[in-house]
Amino acid sequence: MKLTKKLLAMALAGVMLLTILTGCSGGKTGDRLVEEYMATFISENSVDTPITHDVPEIKTVADMFETSWLKADGSWNITSGNNSNDPKYKALKDIFASYKDSCTVTLVAFKVDSTQSELDQAMRVMMSSFYSGLPVYSSGGKTTAVKCATRLVTRENKSYRIAVIIYDHHAAG
């Protein structure tokens, strides 16, 4: 009986591992895997900085995402900056308003295809956040905590990776 339980436990563990590695357990697992890769990348550059994935606002952004937010070349079709009158940018600022005083909030979005692994997508998120991310809020100071979250959304039969990275400059340690 003990041997049977051990064999069943090992088989279940193998199936779970295979599910995670192949991404065959639904969109949430892929999202979480990209978040974990993002956190690993961030932790390499921000040693001893706590990193969480607690950004409920990403769901709101993913739900309201439209393909018109991106130009054909993949750059943002949203005008950002303090003087921006772009209603899409104002809506994003409202969504992330709780971070406005002491955080840097950067939004990233790009089209993905089925050949891109979660690792590839995470690397694109991180590189895009530096070069072509949409700055929602900017704040200076030492980073004391980081939050990152992502969602894969489908619009018009195309998939898009939406991600947010929030560098907190005031969190208590």
Where are each of the predicted segments found?
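Bacterial N-terminal signal peptides that target proteins for export
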Residues: 1-11
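Short N-terminal secondary-structure initiator segments
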Residues: 4, 24-45, 140, 157, ...
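C-terminal motif of bacterial Sec signal peptides marking the signal peptidase cleavage site
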Residues: 19-23
